[in-house]
Amino acid sequence: MAFQVKIHQIRAFVEVARQGSIRGASRMLNMSQPALSKSIQELEEGLAAQLFFRRSKGVTLTDAGESFYQHASLILEELRAAQEDIRQRQGQLAGQINIGMGASISRSLMPTVISRFHQQHPQVKVRIMEGQLVSMINELRQGELDFTINTYYQGPYDHEFTFEKLLEKQFAIFCRPGHPAIGARSIKQLLDYSWTMPTPHGSYYKHLSELLDDQAQTPQVGVVCETFSACISLVAKSDFLSILPEEMGCDPLHGQGLVMLPVSEILPKATYYLIQRRDSRQTPLTASLITQFRRECGYLQS
């Protein structure tokens, strides 16, 4: 008879992988370490594969373990979503929604939508992950994010995800008040200054970099920031220049520390998409939240 993986073995395996140790996972699962070790051992024997390398300071996944983790974590997230879907359809409007946001969306669109949604559904927990799409691909694949709103530019993900265009944003060049570059009227006049940019992997900034390369107007980016806030802080408090959404000049948190440079060149707009796994199924509450984001995007673009 073929080996049948049990759900408690999947939970045990995923938690050990996430915690990096039997001890940490046993605390999270409220199981004894011997019982947890036995569950993992039975799983490995049943699969006829070693899933973990055991070391004195913990465990790490083998290649087989990495592959199994992709499936196992998705199974648990799909099971959670299925349970929440049934409860929500029965009128129990609670649960958790996990979403990803590009930094610009977090500062503009997100606060209005999330505050309104929270007022309507105070029992629903919303977890928000901020960053570029490349930083949340694995979470989307594994079902740990229900959706993200982000930029996307020619990558290998078309077959995995759906991309629904929501809105466009204009970008501009910014500096701090009193910067010596104020008065410049072209990108070429700015090339000798220090520049900082968010990481350019698979996003608007990759498209922008390729476009500027083609025009021989590529700034020398000396500092690449993994977070949008770090990039903004460098611009506001030093002599770095950067390319950011135009709305940053009106942002109540940062607007007074940023000056937009009116160069003659028009920078490309960034297109933001609603991005989901192709095989994902939305719970009623997730569908409701997506609808509210669509409506807010419509208001902003009208």
Regions found by a protein language model. Name each.
Residues 14-32:
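Short helix-boundary/capping micro-motifs
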Residues 132-145, 151, 201-259:
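Hydrophobic hinge/microswitch elements
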Residues 44-63:
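A short LG(V/I)-centered, amphipathic sequence patch enriched
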Residues 94-155, 225:
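Central regulatory/effector-binding core of bacterial HTH transcription factors
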Residues 109, 174, 181-182, 259-302:
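A late-sequence structural motif
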Residues 181-182, 187, 193-215, 282-291, ...:
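Secondary-structure junction motif
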Residues 157-164, 169, 229-278:
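Beta-alpha-beta core module
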Residues 161-195:
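Flexible hinge/capping segments at coil-to-helix
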